[in-house]
Amino acid sequence: MAGSNVLQIEPLTPAIGAVLRGVNLAEPASDGLIDDIRQALLRHQVIFFEDQDLTPTQQRDFAARFGDLHVHPLYDTDNRHPEIMVIDNHVDNPTDNNFWHTDVTFIETPPMGAVLHAKQLPPVGGDTMWASMTAAYRALSTPMQRFLEGLEAVHDFAYAFTPQGLAGSQAGAERYAKAVAENPPVIHPVIRTHPETGEPGIFVNSVFTSRIKGLRREESRALMDFLNRHVQQPEFVVRWRWTPGAVAFWDNRCTQHRAVDDFLPHRRVMHRATILGERPVFSPG
C-alpha cells in the first residue's frame, strides 16, 4: 500500500476504485488531510472508507469541505439536514437507481461528487458498481473520439423522472410540477474535460441524457445505445460490497454508477450528500 503518513491507499482495480484506511471521517479533518483525500479521489475516481460511524451532521460537514451541497428536488431528505438525501429501499419502495448513470446531470452545474454512507444493509446483496468514464473514453478508437468531441447532448429532468408514484397525492403532484418547472433541459458536451486532471471522459448516461443534439432521432438513439453499452465493460468497473458503516466518495465528473437490485425483500438504507460542481466543458488538446 502507498499513501501519506495518515492515509493508506489500496487500489481495487487498475482503472478505478481504492480503499482508504487510517482516517476517521467523524473527526474534523485538517486541510492537509482533505487535500490528501482529494488527490486520492482524483487518482482513483471512487474511494471507500470502512467502519465509519457518522451522524448526518458529520457526513454533511465532511462533504461540505469539498464544495457547496445540493438538495435534490424530489427525493426524501433527513428531517434536520436537507442536504442529506435518504435512500430507503424495501418491498414498498423498490430501488429506482439500478441503471447506469451520473448523478444530477440535468442541471447547469452537475455535482462534482457525492458521499454515500451505509446506514442499514441487507444480509446479502445490495452492492454498488462504478465505471470510469475516462477509461471508457480511452478505449474508443481515435476516429470515434474525434467524432464525439464535437457533439453536445440534452440532459432532461423530465426524461428521467415521471409523475408516477407522486401523483397519488396533491402535495406529490405539486412537488413534481415545481421540480419540472425549475429544471428545464440543459446542454452538456458529450465528452467532458475533467476540470482538475484535464482528462477527457464520456459525459452522457442512460438516465438523464435524452438525445444527442443535432442528430436525427434514430442516429441519436443508435449512438446512445452504443455508448451506454460501451461504458459498462468490466474493465472499466469496480464493484463494492457494502459493510456496515462503509462510505463511498466518488468523482461524479468522470464516473457512472448503479445499484445492484438484488436484495428485496430486505431493507437497504443509505444517506447521500451531493457536492455541487462546475459547468461541464470540453477543451481540445
For each predicted feature, which ranges?
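Non-heme Fe(II) oxygenase catalytic core, chiefly the N-lobe of the double-stranded beta-helix
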Residues: 2-247, 252-285
